[in-house]
Amino acid sequence: MVGSIEAKSLQSNGSVHHIGLNLEEKLDEFRRLLGKSEKDPLRIVSVGAGAWGSVFAALLQESYGGFRDKFQIRIWRRAGRAVDRETAEHLFEVINSREDILRRLIRRCAYLKYVEARLGDRTLYADEILKDGFCLNMVDTPLCPLKVVTNLQEAVWDADIVVNGLPSTETREVFEEISKYWKERITVPIIISLSKGIETALEPVPHIITPTKMIHQATGVPIDNVLYLGGPNIAAEIYNKEYANARICGAAKWRKPLAKFLRQPHFIVWDNSDLVTHEVMGGLKNVYAIGAGMVAALTNESATSKSVYFAHCTSEMIFITHLLAEEPEKLAGPLLADTYVTLLKGRNAWYGQMLAKGEINRDMGDSISGKGMIQGVSAVGAFYQLLSQSSLSILPSEEKKPVAPVESCPILKTLYKILITREQSTQAILQALRDETLNDPRDRIEIAQSHAFYRPSLLGQP
C-alpha cells in the first residue's frame, strides 16, 4: 500500500508521532459521528477517475490509508479503456524519469508490463494503470497506488461516503444505476460532488438542475446529505502539495465535520452554506474559461486583453447568479479565486487556446485524449438554452421592450455561436470584447444586484 502514516507525518512537519496521532483522532472523531463500530471501517468510494477525482482519492489514501482497520478507500472507473501507443510511450518516459516510481513498480513486480507496452507488445488499460497510480488524464503526475474497482455495484453498495468525480453529463445516468444497488440500504450515505456543470429542463418551467440535484433526484438521498466541494484547485498542483483552499458547501450537519476531516496542511477546506451559488459558479467558470483560453491565444497572452475579458465575463457570471439566487454568495475570496485559476489554467482554458491556435478542432468533440471531458462545452449549451427562454424575459434599463436574459450576456452568446452552432470562428470572441456598444461591466453588476431580475423558478422553486 501507500507509504506509512509516519512517512506522511514526517513530510508535514517532522513530528511523526504528533501528526500521526492527529490524523487518527480526526478519523476516530468522524467515525464516531457516523456511528461506526470498532471493527467496521469507514468506507469511501470515488466514482469516476478523472484528474480531480483520482487526486481526491489519492489525498485521502495518503492521509488515512495507513489505518487499515479503520479506513478503506476505493475508486471506480469503467473497464475496457485502452491506453494508446503514444500515451504508453510517454508514460514509460515518466516512469524512468522518477527513481521513486521506478523502484515502486519494480518492488510491486509491475514494471515489465510498461516495458512491453512501450515496445508495442502489450496493451495497457486505464483501470490497470490507475492501480499503479497513473491517471490516464494526468500521466505526468504519478499518484499513490489505489484500489480500483470496475464493478459499480461492488464499489458502492456498502459505501459510507461516495465522491462524485464524474462529469456532469454522466452524473445522472451513473447515479440512477447506483440507486438500484441501494434499495435495501438501512443507512443513508453521504455524497460529495466534485462535478461542475448543469442540465437544463424546460418543463414545467425553464430551470436548471445542478449535479447535487441530479444525485438527489436519481438516488432519493436527502439533499442534506449531498454536498459540493469547490476550488480553487488544479488537480496536479494539489497532489504536488501546492498550497490550496477549497470550500465544501451544503447543510451544516455534514459540511462542518467534513471540512475538518478533509483538511490537510497544504489543502485547507472551509465550509459554506451557499450550495447553489458555488455549484452554479462551478459550471459557469468552465464556460468562460474556454473564452479566456481563446483570448490568450489570439492576443499572444496580452495581459490587458485578458483583464478586459475577465471584467466582462465575471460581470456576466454575477448577473446570472443573481437571476438564480436572491442573495448569492459574493464573487470574492475563494469563489473568485476558483474562477481566476480556472480562467488562467485548466483543461477548459487549454481547450479554448488549442481551438484558437488551430491545434484541435470542434469536430473532435468535447472529450479529448489526455485531458478528459471538457465540461465547459456542454455547459455553454445548457446556460444558453436556459437564458434564451422568452418566458424569463427581463427589461434592462437601455431596452424599450423585454428581452431574454441571454441578451445581457454577450460573451455567453458568442461562445454559443462558436462552440455549439459553429456559425462563428474563435476570432468572434475578440469582436465581442471590442464592441463599442458594450456597457461598462459595472452596469450589469448594479442591475443584477438590484434584485429586479431574480427568478426563483430557475431553480425549480415556486
Swiss-Prot record:
Tissue: Expressed in roots, leaves, flowers and siliques.
Location in or out of the cell: Cytoplasm, Cytosol
Catalytic residues as annotated in Swiss-Prot or TrEMBL: K285 (proton acceptor)
Function text: Involved in cell redox homeostasis. Required for maintaining a steady state cellular NADH/NAD(+) ratio through a mitochondrial glycerol-3-phosphate redox shuttle. May function with the mitochondrial FAD-dependent glycerol-3-phosphate dehydrogenase SDP6 to shuttle reducing equivalents into the mitochondria for respiration.
Catalytic reaction(s) noted: sn-glycerol 3-phosphate + NAD(+) = dihydroxyacetone phosphate + NADH + H(+)
Ligand binding (substrate): K196, R347, N348
Disruption phenotype: No visible phenotype under normal growth conditions, but mutant plants have increased NADH/NAD(+) ratios, decreased levels of glycerol-3-phosphate, and produce constitutive high levels of reactive oxygen species (ROS).
InterPro entries linked: 6-PGluconate_DH-like_C_sf, 6PGD_dom2, G3P_DH_NAD-dep, G3P_DH_NAD-dep_C, G3P_DH_NAD-dep_N, NAD(P)-bd_dom_sf
Protein's name in the database: Glycerol-3-phosphate dehydrogenase [NAD(+)] GPDHC1, cytosolic
Induction data: By abscisic acid and salt and dehydration treatments. Down-regulated by hypoxia.
Catalytic class of the enzyme: oxidoreductase
GO molecular function: glycerol-3-phosphate dehydrogenase (NAD+) activity; NAD binding
Protein EC: 1.1.1.8
Chain residues that bind NAD(+): G48, A49, G50, A51, W52, G53, K196, A235, R347, Q375
Family indicated by similarity: Belongs to the NAD-dependent glycerol-3-phosphate dehydrogenase family.
Keywords: Cytoplasm, NAD, Oxidoreductase, Stress response
Assigned GO CC terms: cytosol
Signal peptide (UniProt feature, chain positions): none
Example GO biological process: glycerol-3-phosphate catabolic process
